[in-house]
């Protein structure tokens, strides 16, 4: 049975956000405090973004947006399929590119980027072809490993140095701008919420509980992680490309000298899990556009096109223009709020017209 439980979907979404959290904190912020305030505001906005998923679940028996659009017309289904396919392509493009770019920051910059992309995409394609329940179980295991790794690193960091809480300040030239940038940044990183829409038909349970649990735990996870990194690294937390990696290198214990290897292991598998879930959903969207499309081919295409674009950008040494571009937050809002509501409105209008015809 291709079903996924509430906890499994929660794990899929949180694993995705954990990867983006481990990847980097943008250097565009003057201090961590304004970023933490922005995270709080963005979470409140994300509560509103979850409303369309709840409406679709209760009013339309949990259809995904593309299937729901098909209830109105074939043309609307095709349009929805194209939009969400491109959304997941962009999602895969950022995941793949960010992974390889920030791998450059940890390892030598002279390894073949294309080979790394092919390796990661091959593993993600394999996972993307699995059933939703398999993706959910894999995410659950990885979420547990991420939690264990985080606890060990934080505990080891506290045992090595004194905590410096003076780094929590609001000394900034433009606090309002910094907070608004943080809000946009978190909305962009939270493209994982789109999973909520496309796992609806396979979900055993209510999206209300999943979204509430995810947003609550995500808020606590991000705030505590940024807080601990700030306490350990100070202002360096906002200038380091990989503050989690820096803290892992800095942390030590009586049994483990450094946590770099653990960081890399958890980070790589989180990237594969996140990309695998993206490819799984992207194949569903391609099916809405081309009903006779082979699923295996759809998953491979969903990985190949974004990967090729990412490699082209990486080889031109121009990935920073993408990595630190926050305009993608509009895509999260559009994909989660506006498009589902427009589709639902078209379906309701058709139902009303059909009811009027029957009543005439």
Located regions from the model:
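Membrane-interface interhelical connector segments
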Residues: 232-260
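Membrane helical hairpin/interfacial module
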Residues: 16-113, 122
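Selective recognition of specific alpha-helical transmembrane segments in multi-pass small-molecule
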Residues: 41-53, 85-95, 123-125, 144-158, ...
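Membrane-interface "cap" regions at the ends of multi-pass membrane proteins
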Residues: 1-28, 178-183, 203, 346-360
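Helix-loop-helix junctions that connect adjacent transmembrane segments
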Residues: 101-119, 144-205, 235-243, 264
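Hydrophobic, small-residue-rich membrane helices and short re-entrant helix-turn-helix hairpins
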Residues: 129-142, 172, 176, 194-217, ...
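Membrane-interface loop-to-helix entry segments
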Residues: 114-115, 127-157, 328-339
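Hydrophobic alpha-helical segments and their helix-loop junctions in multi-pass secondary transporters
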Residues: 5, 89-100, 128, 146-171, ...
């Amino acid at each position: 049975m291709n079903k996924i439980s509430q906890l499994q979907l929660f794990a899929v979404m949180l694993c995705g956000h954990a990867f983006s959290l481990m990847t980097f904190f943008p250097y565009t912020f003057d201090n961590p405090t304004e970023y933490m305030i922005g995270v709080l505001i963005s979470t409140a906005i994300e509560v509103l973004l979850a409303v369309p998923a709840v409406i679709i679940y209760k009013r339309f028996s949990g259809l995904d947006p593309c299937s729901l659009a098909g209830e109105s017309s074939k043309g609307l289904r095709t349009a929805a399929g194209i939009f969400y396919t491109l959304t997941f392509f962009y999602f895969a493009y950022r995941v793949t590119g960010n992974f390889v770019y920030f791998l450059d920051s940890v390892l030598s910059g002279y390894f073949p980027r294309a080979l790394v992309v092919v390796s990661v995409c091959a593993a993600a394609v394999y996972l993307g072809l699995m059933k939703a329940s398999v993706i959910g179980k894999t995410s659950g295991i990885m979420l547990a490993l991420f939690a264990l790794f985080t606890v060990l690193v934080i505990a080891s960091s506290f045992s090595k140095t004194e905590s410096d809480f003076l780094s929590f300040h609001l000394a900034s030239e433009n606090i309002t701008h910094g907070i608004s940038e943080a809000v946009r940044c978190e909305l962009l990183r939270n493209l994982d919420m789109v999973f909520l829409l496309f796992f609806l038909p396979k979900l055993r349970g209510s999206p209300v509980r999943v979204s509430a649990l995810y947003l609550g735990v995500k808020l606590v996870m991000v705030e505590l992680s940024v807080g601990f990194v700030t306490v350990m690294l100070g202002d360096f937390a906002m200038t380091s490309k990989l503050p989690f990696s820096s803290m892992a290198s800095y942390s030590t214990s009586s049994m483990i000298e450094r946590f770099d290897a653990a960081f890399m292991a958890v980070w790589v598998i989180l990237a594969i899990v996140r990309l695998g879930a993206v490819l799984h959903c992207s194949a569903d969207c391609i099916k809405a556009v081309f009903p006779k499309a082979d699923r295996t081919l759809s998953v491979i295409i969903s990985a190949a096109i974004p990967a090729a674009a990412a490699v082209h950008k990486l080889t031109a040494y121009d990935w920073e223009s993408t990595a630190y571009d926050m305009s993608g937050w509009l895509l999260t809002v559009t994909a989660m709020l506006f498009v589902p509501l427009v589709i639902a409105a078209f379906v309701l209008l058709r139902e009303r017209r059909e009811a009027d015809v029957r009543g005439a």
